């Protein structure tokens, strides 16, 4: 579905047409805006994504889509995925999300603690309110750090799983992909709890009152 919409949008877009100015403003920054696959199922969103690409990138994308579709038509019945392929798909999707979960939890804990010890004491906000503000800081940081995490995952040398077009569309592939993301986030969030090791319990600092 997404590939068909992309092909139609690429065919309707002239290769040398300039990118609209408002899209340039949307893409200012170190990394381009991240587009999720499910966001490309609507024609307008797909067209906006295609318009944001440079002519060279648009040509490469069109060529790759046409090659993919031709392989799909030429290939017969898809061979079953092996256990090694499923493990690699899971690992390939888990590694980037370990970084996402780690940064999200670590920044939230560190920021929430500092907010509680500074602004929280001044304004008298609760611990949950400080945690919510820490989560806000973590989400804002994630907007800028997501691209760097993806770039680091690519530098680790993990190649895209070598699958046929029909194997890509198998339900086993999608399940392994989602499981890898879930496991990666879980591991990353657990590792991201490390700031708690450096936070002393405030209750231990308070002098204990002698019971009468």
From Swiss-Prot:
Tissue expression: Expression is restricted to the heart (at protein level).
Keywords annotated in UniProt: Cell membrane, Membrane, Mitochondrion, Mitochondrion inner membrane, Transmembrane, Transmembrane helix
Protein name (Swiss-Prot/TrEMBL): Transmembrane protein 65
Listed InterPro entries: TMEM65 (IPR019537)
Disulfide bonding pattern of the chain: none
Signal peptide bounds: none
Topology Cytoplasmic: residue spans: 1-88, 138-139, 200-212
Domain of life: Eukaryota
Transmembrane annotation, as ranges: 89-109, 117-137, 140-160, 179-199
Segments on the Extracellular face: 110-116, 161-178
Cellular component GO terms, alphabetical: mitochondrial inner membrane; mitochondrion; plasma membrane
Quaternary structure note: Monomer. Homodimer. Interacts with GJA1.
Outcome of gene disruption: Morpholino knockdown of the protein causes pericardial edema and altered cardiac morphology in 4 days post-fertilization (dpf) embryos and severity increases as embryos age. Morrphants are not viable by 7 dpf. Hearts showed abnormal cardiac looping in the morphants and a significant decline in heart beat rates seen in after 4.5 dpf and continue decreasing at 5 and 6 dpf. Ventricles show a significant reduction in amplitude of Ca(2+) transients in morphants between 4 and 6 dpf.
Biological-process GO terms, alphabetical: cardiac conduction; cardiac ventricle development; heart development; regulation of cardiac conduction
């Amino acid at each position: 579905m997404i590939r068909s919409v992309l092909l139609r949008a690429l065919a309707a877009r002239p290769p040398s047409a300039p990118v609209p100015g408002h899209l340039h403003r949307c893409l200012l920054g170190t990394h381009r805006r991240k587009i999720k696959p499910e966001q490309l199922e609507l024609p307008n969103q797909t067209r906006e994504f295609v318009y944001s690409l440079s002519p060279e990138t648009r040509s490469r994308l069109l060529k790759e889509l046409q090659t993919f579709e031709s392989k799909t038509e030429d290939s017969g019945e898809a061979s079953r995925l092996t256990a090694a392929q499923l493990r690699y798909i899971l690992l390939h999707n888990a590694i980037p999300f370990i970084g996402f979960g780690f940064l999200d939890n670590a920044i939230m804990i560190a920021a929430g603690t500092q907010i509680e010890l500074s602004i929280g004491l001044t304004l008298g906000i609760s611990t949950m309110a400080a945690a919510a503000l820490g989560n806000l800081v973590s989400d804002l940081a994630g907007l800028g750090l997501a691209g760097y995490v993806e770039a680091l995952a690519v530098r680790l040398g993990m190649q895209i799983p070598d699958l046929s077009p029909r194997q890509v569309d198998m339900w086993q592939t999608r399940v392994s992909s989602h499981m890898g993301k879930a496991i990666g986030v879980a591991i990353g969030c657990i590792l991201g709890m490390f700031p708690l090791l450096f936070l002393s319990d405030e209750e231990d600092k308070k002098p204990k009152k002698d019971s009468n």
